[in-house]
């Protein structure tokens, strides 16, 4: 068994942003293997550019290819970073679909599969403080910053 891939919050958000805007995992893998970022250009937005995506990952020893194929754990989540990662990854709107405050995310309703992805990806400085099964088979989650 191999260790779980660790990704910075920066790389995780860029990866999920690409997926959110329709870039397939195969296209992401091709970009990683060839260095040709053209396929990622459709996901570029004001704060999400891919110019440094591969060089940042290489410089920080991130295994992007394995992260795409096997999943990953974020090394550290900031409040805003976690809020943005949740919004992009699960196509949710902060303040509407979930609440995010200092050291707290609540009212987050996910499918079982989404909850599992969150559980596997969430940085260790956060934890799932509460999980309630909803009547329609979803999970309502409360996340807290450790130590708060």
Model features per residue range: what roles?
Residues 1-148:
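Structural boundary micro-motifs
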């Amino acid at each position: 068994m191999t260790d779980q891939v660790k990704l910075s919050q920066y790389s995780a958000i860029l990866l999920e942003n690409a997926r959110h805007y329709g870039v397939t995992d195969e296209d992401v893998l091709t970009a990683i293997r060839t260095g040709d970022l053209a396929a990622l250009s459709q996901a570029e937005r004001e704060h999400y550019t891919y110019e440094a995506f591969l060089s940042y990952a290489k410089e920080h020893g991130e295994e992007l290819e394995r992260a795409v194929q096997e999943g990953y754990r974020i090394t550290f989540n900031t409040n805003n970073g976690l809020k943005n990662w949740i919004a992009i990854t699960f196509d949710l709107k902060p303040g509407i679909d979930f609440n995010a405050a200092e050291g707290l995310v609540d009212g987050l309703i996910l499918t079982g599969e989404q909850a599992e992805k969150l559980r596997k990806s969430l940085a260790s400085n956060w934890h799932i403080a509460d999980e309630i099964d909803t009547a329609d088979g979803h999970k309502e989650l409360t996340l807290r910053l450790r130590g708060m």
